[in-house]
Amino acid sequence: MYLKLLATCVITVILSSCSSASEPKQLQAGAAAANITPSLGSLTIGGFRPIPATHIHDELFARCIVLDDGDTQIAIVVADILGLPKEVCDLAKEQVAQHTNIPASHVLIAATHTHSAATPRGPKGVFWKDEISDYGQFLAQKFSDGIRRAVNNLEPAQIGWGVALEPREVFNRRW
């Protein structure tokens, strides 16, 4: 699903750059990763009941990419988290729009859906609307910071793609 969405965004950037009659513009891309690991004791909710984290096996990241065709910039964030409330994404998009030339409507934020992460919803979990928790505010700031760093890392880029089968990478490991 993320690949289709990324491909759609990339194609949009390419098509918008092809329609210009002026001098050719260079596609630029920038990337950054922001550590979004919560503190020990944060509630992990992937097992459908909150369990406090007692150790960190792997750090959690929000991976950010910015594409710029000279006319339009888009930002994509993929975060290692179970899910993201709209309120957290909206806050991050507001911060991005405030600090960059990227409008909120050009920012895509998605979750990897890991079951080993904390929730930005606070103690009520993901199923009830709640005010943005401290961790949710932390996430929004980290997403915004990651996008700003990706903008600072913009450099000339080319787009390519390929296809390969790797059945050992996609399977249900637990059930």
Which residues fall in each region the model found?
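Bacterial N-terminal signal peptides
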Residues: 4-17
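Conserved beta-alpha junction segments in alpha/beta enzyme cores
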Residues: 23-175
